[in-house]
Amino acid sequence: EPLNNGVDYLWASNKLQDVTSTQVSMPILFQHCATQIVFNISAGSGIKLDKLVSASITPANPGATMDMITGEITPSTTYSTETANMGINGFTAQYIMLPLKTNTAMPLTLQILADGENTPRTYNVNVLLPNGELAGGDSYVFSAVIDGNSVSFPNVEVLGWTEVDETGKPLYPSQKPD
């Protein structure tokens, strides 16, 4: 079955299993196979951010497959024809997507209320992928700085995606009601 964006695919393996004893104990450690992308948005000079209204990206083309022996999802080399809404928590936006390998920048659209205005400002930017990829099992945390009419990305952290609660859900960010 082809895989889709927006799904946290988990995979586990245990090569040290002993099923011959009467008390079978098999520790299972799940790992994330998709990729997580996070944008931490902050104000630069000359602007006061009031609210992140919406964030959307163009994720990897869906339809990838997972190797059930290794848990690896084959990365797409192209973007989807559809955008995806990101989860928002304060000034943090997050999305789970299939792995992607391309040197083409990823489209990102942010709608932000700033400086006490009632109409959101729209920022359309292209985000370069670190080393041309978003690898499965990793979390990419971008710092996004809004400076009036532009967005810059001064830093991106590539982390092993292990930050989960007891149910396996990502710890950050979660959707908050308005």
What would you call each of these model-derived segments?
Residues 114-122:
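Short acidic/polar inter-strand loop motif in beta-rich domains
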Residues 52-55, 121-131, 158:
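Composition- and surface-driven signal marking solvent-exposed, interaction-prone regions
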Residues 3-13, 124-147:
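Short beta-strand elements
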Residues 46-80:
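Short, ordered, surface-exposed loop/turn motifs in non-cytosolic proteins
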Residues 141-178:
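Intrinsically disordered, low-complexity repeat and linker tracts
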Residues 1-51, 78, 84-85, 90-93, ...:
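Short, low-hydrophobicity acidic/polar segments
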Residues 66-90, 103, 125-129:
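Short, surface-exposed loop motifs enriched in S/T, G, D/E and P with embedded aromatic residues
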Residues 44, 51-58, 134, 140-141, ...:
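N-terminal small/polar-rich segments of proteins
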